[in-house]
Amino acid sequence: RYEEPVIKERDAHNRFPATSSVAYKSGFLNRPIVDEYVEILWACMKLLWPGIQRKQHSYRVFLSHDVDRPFFVYDQSWHQIFRNIAGDLTIRKDLSLALQRIKCKVRNDSTLDPANTFDFIMDLSEKYDLKSEFYFMTDHTAGSLDGSEYSIESLQITKLMHRIYERGHRIGLHGSYNSFSNPQQIKKEFERLMKTTEKLGIKQDSWGGRQHYLRFENPITWQSWEDAGLNYDSTLGFADNIGFRCGTCHEFPVFNLETKRVLHLR
């Protein structure tokens, strides 16, 4: 991502926009251009060395979900709920949603919460023999921009995380809004996740996640994740367009442009 430190355009959330990229301007953002170059190189190599063998890769699907707001009702005060109900009735014109909020709060039952779709997502993932990853926030550095200010140590969230793990799915970090350029904050948030999962007996062979709002600064964000002990990052998509921000559909080792060093982070 050499162009990102060089080109200075940023959007309202200080993100490098797809529209400023060479790929978008040249019309190949929706093509994995690096992978296409590899295929051309391989075709040339086969002509020169017909007996050469190539490592075969299998296709895999990785499903990941940012947990910005785990519940709409369960962890809210009546004041917040009535404000949302007013919006349901006057803006969204959805009486059933308003009634569902009241029912969930009165019964104190998170399974009735309209935002509680975790089991639905896991059921659907398992139907197709897939594992889902759920990225939790462990700190909220920007108030409402970070969704609902839930606590990762709360009983409801720890029960949810343990249920995800018991069903064979994965837990990860969703870095808060202001953490992307703050190495100390990323370290703090990941340590909090590790402390909580350790208490719950959650063990994984690797840990990853994604930055909130896809906020990213090269090379600070990647280096911060590496230094904090994370193994992989899935932030590198664009917020304003779909496409291949890194020009590939394969995972790859990260390169720090300042230190000229390949990182362990992928």
What are these language model-derived features?
Residues 179-261:
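Catalytic domains of cell-wall/extracellular-matrix polysaccharide-remodeling enzymes
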Residues 66, 174, 225:
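Conserved hydrophobic/aromatic pocket- or pore-lining residues that grip, position, or stack substrates
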